[in-house]
Curated annotation (Swiss-Prot):
GO terms for cellular component: plasma membrane. The keyword Transmembrane helix applies. Keywords: Cell membrane, Membrane, Transmembrane, Transmembrane helix. Coiled coil: none annotated. The lineage of its organism: Bacteria, Pseudomonadati, Pseudomonadota, Alphaproteobacteria, Hyphomicrobiales. This is UPF0391 membrane protein bsl6560. Belongs to the UPF0391 family. The keyword Nuclease does not apply.
Length: 57
């Protein structure tokens, strides 16, 4: 699950760079939403992983 979160985080960062750079102005809001969802999922996965005793990040 953590692998998917990291993948979506990278995709969101790329979309954010393209959107904030002016290449795709309409994707700014989508990139923001995807980025924050990815950050939340990453944090939840990290906390659950640490709570289970696994540190496989």
């Amino acid at each position: 699950m953590l692998g998917w979160v990291v993948t979506f985080l990278v995709i969101a960062l790329i979309a954010g760079i393209l959107g904030f750079g002016g290449i795709a102005g309409a994707s700014i809001e989508i990139a923001k939403i995807i980025f924050f969802i990815a950050v939340v999922l990453f944090l939840v996965s990290a906390v659950v992983g640490l709570a289970r005793g696994r540190t496989r990040i």
